[in-house]
Amino acid sequence: MVQKQQASAGPGTEPKKRRRVGFSPADTGVEANECIKIYLVSSKEEVDSSDISSVKPVDLNDFFDGDGKIYGYQGLKINVWINSISLHSYADITYQSTINGDKGITDLKSALQNIFAETIVDTKDEFLQTFSTQRDFIRNMVSNGEVMHAGATDGSSKNAEVVPSDPQVIRMEIGSPNAGLLYSRLVPLVLLFVDGSNPIDVTDPDWHLYLLIQKKEEKEDPLYRIVGFTAIYKFYRYPDRLRMRLSQILVLPSFQGKGLGSYLMEVVNNVAITENVYDLTVEEPSEKFQHIRTCIDINRLRSFDPIKPDIDSAVQTLTKGKLSKKAQIPRFTPPLNAIEKVRESLKINKKQFLKCWEILIYLALDPIDKYMEDYTSVITNHVRTDILGKDIETPKKQVVDVPSSFEPEASFVVFKSVNGEEANTNVQVDENKPDQEQQLKQLVEERIREIKLVAEKVSKSGQTLKV
């Protein structure tokens, strides 16, 4: 290698200074979950109050690109205040210093606007003013809505009034005046508190909002605020029916555990019945909501007389002998006419009813400990069927080639196997079968745990579901 020579410095010459190469300092960043806190407040006095606790949203890291971290700040703290009256928000951002490290500096304003959109205001003073200037926002927005009840709808479609004593549900078509604007302010709550949810299409008239409204009497005019809501889509089912699909449901964190979620679901169930839709479905329910929904449906089914003989028949069969010792275990699924009766009368869809059916049988077994082994065998059979995606007990068609001098490529016979077992002696055993059996066992244990939790809750007489 040829090196470039440098002229030697004379005795009276100062040595040349070396250029320093600058490197950006390493910045490990901070997770959004660690530095952002969310507060729901209903008055300006609650802002910055030590008596107000933060609420836990979904994973905030998901709102920040890449690894979910915020870069370029030391000692970063972000307190986001949400006005539960007007649904405006304000972010109080503090930090010790900024560091323009190897990851740059996160644009906090842009990141927060991706969540809160037009609801976020720039200054604290502007935010505090919304408690007075936007005091009647909810009241004005829902004035043309339809008041719904758990027992029946009153049919009114204008000038909806809320009874002060109890929260009530007001329905609004998304295409109606004010509904789109109102939902746009609800979107941040959807993103923050409904896991995996996306905003609905406000241009699609088949969407309906069911708003859980609380009316609070004050010295001035009554104060209206939203404590929960659900978004439901109606779609066509051939030849002449509609189905209802519940897509989003939320009770604000500070109002959870008071039975409001159960009341909202009771209203929705009643709407499905009174409007005679085909059935009510739920889009990708969370584990928590599925538990609530199942508890509600179990109570409805326990008082539904047409299926009681079917439950008794299934229980009698299960208690006759040691099912766990039998080669073929009956499915213990409800008869088709029971499924149809439940769908037509209660609007519970087949998939949900099958889950409830297992719990109804569990509740009817007395004493449960005596029959738990056989019951577990039934649940194992159900779980295995769910995994396979088909009924393992249904006779399967098999094709077997047979010798023929007429047309060898087209010579075969078709027959149904006995008890759903394939008559093939060359069955290959999956090398991972022990792992599959262990996974099956874990799934069964999880299903049994869910069944017991629901059964315990609904068995407590006189207890109102606090969800």
From Swiss-Prot:
The active site is at E283. It is found in: Nucleus; Cytoplasm. It comes from the Eukaryota. Pfam families: Acetyltransf_1, Hat1_N. GO terms for cellular component: chromosome, telomeric region; cytoplasm; nucleus. Its EC number is 2.3.1.48. InterPro entries: Acyl_CoA_acyltransferase, GNAT_dom, Hat1_N, Hat1_N_sf, Hist_AcTrfase_B-typ_cat-su. The record marks W207 as: Interaction with histone H4 N-terminus. Acetyl-CoA binds at I249, L250, V251, Q256, G257, K258, G259, L260, G261, S262. Keywords: Acyltransferase, Cytoplasm, Nucleus, Transferase. It catalyses: L-lysyl-[protein] + acetyl-CoA = N(6)-acetyl-L-lysyl-[protein] + CoA + H(+). GO terms for molecular function: histone H4 acetyltransferase activity. CDD domains: NAT_SF. Residues 1-24 are annotated as: Disordered. It is an enzyme of class 2 (transferase). Disulfide bonds: none annotated. The keyword Acyltransferase applies. Its main location: nucleus. GO terms for biological process: subtelomeric heterochromatin formation. Acetylates soluble but not nucleosomal H4. Acetylates 'Lys-12' of histone H4. Belongs to the HAT1 family. This is Histone acetyltransferase type B catalytic subunit.
